[in-house]
Amino acid sequence: MKLSQFKFKLPEDKIALHPAKYRDESRLMVVHKSTGKIEHKVFKDILDYFDDKDVFIFNDTKVFPARLYGNKEKTGARIEVFLLRELNEELRLWDVLVDPARKIRIGNKLYFGDDDSMVAEVIDNTTSRGRTLRFLYDGSHDEFKKALYALGEAPLPSFIRRPVEEEDAERFQTIFAKNEGAVTAPTAGLHFSRELMKRMEIKGIDFAFVTMHAGLGNFREIDVEDLTKHKMDSEQMYVNADACRIVNNAKDEGKNICAVGTTVMRTIETAVGTDGHLKEFDGWTNKFIFPPYDFSVANSMVTNFHLPLSTLLMLVAAYGGYDLVMEAYHTALKEDYRFGTYGDAMLILDK
């Protein structure tokens, strides 16, 4: 398929700047693959489509406050540093993106905090905007991380055009976030409240948790028309024995398995064996899913409404069928659904 097939006009006022007041009260569009029927619901109604022993697979990654603002030595010029991942705990080395990149060179010192309490030195250039920083900090690793994160803020995507607010620390995180490492939230999971998950448990629905540390590659623009030539950034993922057991049992019993989000779908499609069963996995994936694609594990998925030309939209179109998903998006625009990270949700049912 071609990149241009995923272009559509998205007015800026359709992008949600804030989450719904309550997690489970965002809107939910239900799309039935077999009939093409589209229903309009509230997210907590998702319960009506699942039964005893069905399984929801969640991504339990935890977002860390990855965006820092600081100053460059001597000039005092304001700079932004986006933390990607820790490279070496002992040496306090981090892989980061910097802005403005042209002014930040090897050997520069960067200062963070009102009293310049945190200092970092640029020790390598990795890409045009990528740098390796060494943070200069006396104290334990835990104290360092605490001090670093106190200076950072929730790394909202650039299409949410507003300053970070207090609510973002909580709402840009799922309630089941556990394993730290993501620089963006697995957005489909944001709609699940404690109350909804309790009601799901009471109904006998099982939960499986996998981990994919969602990275900035989710928002990187594709610069090739031929999608087979696009390379995804690698993301770290884990699938443990518990998740395999829960998912494989449900599959063997013909139960409905729901992938909550594109990160979960990429994780399970990476970790599936040739027999269609989920296998344990600890490593990295750069799997890019776009139409046509044969899915092996899930027979339903929850996802948000994504931006034009995004790899996220391509995965959803591969799962729901290109024509049906693009029709659903057209309907969503007409019916004033909210798009993006803090927007509304879609449930695609294949059973």
Swiss-Prot record:
Its pathway? tRNA modification; tRNA-queuosine biosynthesis
Which GO molecular function entries does the Swiss-Prot or TrEMBL record give?
A: S-adenosylmethionine:tRNA ribosyltransferase-isomerase activity
Cell compartment(s), UniProt? Cytoplasm
Record keywords: Ubl conjugation included? no
Catalytic EC class? transferase
Origin: domain of life = Bacteria
One GO cellular component term of this record is: cytoplasm
Q: Which GO terms describe its biological process?
A: queuosine biosynthetic process; tRNA wobble guanine modification
Q: Does the keyword Cytoplasm apply?
A: yes
What are the record keywords, sorted? Answer: Cytoplasm, Queuosine biosynthesis, S-adenosyl-L-methionine, Transferase
E.C. no = 2.4.99.17
**Subunit notes for this chain?**
Monomer.
What is this protein's function?
Transfers and isomerizes the ribose moiety from AdoMet to the 7-aminomethyl group of 7-deazaguanine (preQ1-tRNA) to give epoxyqueuosine (oQ-tRNA).
Q: What is this protein called?
A: S-adenosylmethionine:tRNA ribosyltransferase-isomerase
Species name: Phocaeicola vulgatus (strain ATCC 8482 / DSM 1447 / JCM 5826 / CCUG 4940 / NBRC 14291 / NCTC 11154)
